[in-house]
Each structure stands twice: as structure tokens, then as C-alpha cells.
């Protein structure tokens, strides 16, 4: 039986998030510049988006560019921004054809103006698509997100819009970048690293983690299916005992 046929379609994770890691090391192994790894990594993105859409996964969030990534060499950052623009232009028809909605989270105003415009244009064009919501985390850091959330709520408390006693999880959720997304069910990280890297710290509270040694450029639909099969074999207890769930 193929790995895809082992997936139970009635128990799919509603929200998959991926830390796409290993582009640079993949390129280095082949004696290439890091840029080459990023270009190949863009093809892996297409594979995973197609795989999620075909299965019926409703939400996919990709860690595309962190707040810390601005500290990388200037040429690499410029190349990543150019690659983002070209990918958006190239894939807009595919997104529309497959009923995929593009979303973005992060401090988007920090993006170069051309990138921001292209991104917001595609988001507007695809806003009514329903099959899959593809969220790109760009200029994103979870601590930055939480600081922004606290500031927003603090202003509302100061202006008597929100009472401090009424602040709960739902209020915090409403002020996060991910306010319209469900919590993450499955978090995947490629390249063998086993850390979170300041990604969706609030939203992964009950997520199942899946780490693979595969570098991101080599990550195909089959590896996605393998991660989902592994996820479906786990017992998600949310603080309860196995006996309570049975």
C-alpha cells in the first residue's frame, strides 16, 4: 500500500505548519551557492501546497522569512525577496485554478515596497478561495507577534474598551496575526534540527511535532504524507488521560 493510501482522510490535521529548513546546507553539499538552495526550495513549496490541497487539508502555514533573517547577508536577503516576487507572479494562476487562498502574517510593513504590493495584490485576488488557506509567515517572529498583541490589548484596556478581568485566550487569539486561523495540529521541521525558532509559540500549544532529517529542497509530497501518517498514529490527549478519551 502506498504511503498516501495509508492516510485516513477523515482524520486529517486541520492546520499544518512547516519550518522549511536546510536550503543552505542542501546547496553546500552540492558545491552551490545558498541561493541555489532557496530556488530549489521554492519547488518544494509547490509540492507541499499541491499535496495539502489534494488531500483536503484546510490550512497550511509556511515559515518563509523570520524577523531574524533580516540579519543574513544583504545579497541573500535581496535574492529571497526577488524569489518571493517571482514565485507570487508565477503561481497566481495556479492558486486561482486550485481555489487556494493566500494569506500572510508577520510585520509585513518591513518588506520591500514591491514585495508588499505584489503580496497584497495576490492576497486580494484570492481572498474568496475556499479549498486551502496558504499562509506565508514573512518578517515573522512569535515574540514580536506576542509583544504586538500585548500592546494592542493594553491600549484597549487604557481606553476602557476591554476590561482586564475579561482578558482570556479568545481575546488574545483575536489580536494575534493568526486571528482567523485555527491552532496548529501538526508542526513539521525539516533538516534534522529540533527546535521551534520563534515560530507560532502560542499557536502550537497542543501541536504534534514531526522532525525529519530531509533538507527542505528534497521534501516532496511523499514526505508530507509520511508526516501525516505518523501524526494519525498518535493519541492527542489535550491534558486528559487515555482512559478519558476512550
What are these regions (language model features)?
Residues 1-246:
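Flexible, compositionally biased loop and terminal segments
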Amino acid at each position: 500500500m502506498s504511503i498516501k493510501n495509508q492516510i485516513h482522510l477523515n482524520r486529517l490535521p486541520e492546520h499544518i505548519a512547516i519550518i522549511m529548513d536546510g536550503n543552505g546546507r542542501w546547496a553546500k553539499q552540492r558545491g552551490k551557492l545558498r541561493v541555489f538552495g532557496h530556488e530549489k526550495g521554492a519547488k518544494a513549496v509547490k509540492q507541499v501546497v499541491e499535496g495539502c490541497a489534494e488531500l483536503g487539508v484546510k490550512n497550511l502555514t509556511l515559515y518563509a522569512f523570520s524577523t531574524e533573517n533580516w540579519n543574513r547577508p544583504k545579497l541573500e536577503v535581496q535574492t529571497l525577496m526577488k524569489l518571493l516576487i517571482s514565485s507570487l507572479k508565477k503561481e497566481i494562476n495556479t492558486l486561482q485554478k486550485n481555489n487556494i487562498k493566500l494569506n500572510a502574517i508577520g510585520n509585513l510593513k518591513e518588506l520591500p515596497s514591491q514585495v508588499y504590493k505584489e503580496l497584497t495584490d495576490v492576497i486580494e485576488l484570492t481572498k474568496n478561495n475556499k479549498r486551502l488557506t496558504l499562509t506565508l509567515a514573512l518578517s515573522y517572529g512569535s515574540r514580536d507577534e506576542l509583544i504586538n498583541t500585548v500592546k494592542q490589548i493594553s491600549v484597549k484596556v487604557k481606553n476602557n474598551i476591554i476590561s482586564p478581568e475579561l482578558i482570556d485566550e479568545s481575546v488574545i487569539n483575536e489580536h494575534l496575526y493568526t486571528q482567523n486561523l485555527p491552532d496548529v495540529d501538526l508542526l513539521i521541521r525539516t533538516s534534522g534540527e529540533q527546535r521551534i525558532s520563534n515560530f507560532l509559540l502560542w499557536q502550537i500549544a497542543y501541536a504534534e511535532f514531526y522532525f525529519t532529517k530531509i533538507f527542505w529542497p528534497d521534501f516532496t509530497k511523499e514526505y508530507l504524507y509520511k508526516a501525516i501518517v505518523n501524526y494519525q498514529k498518535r493519541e492527542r490527549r489535550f491534558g486528559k488521560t487515555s482512559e478519558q478519551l476512550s
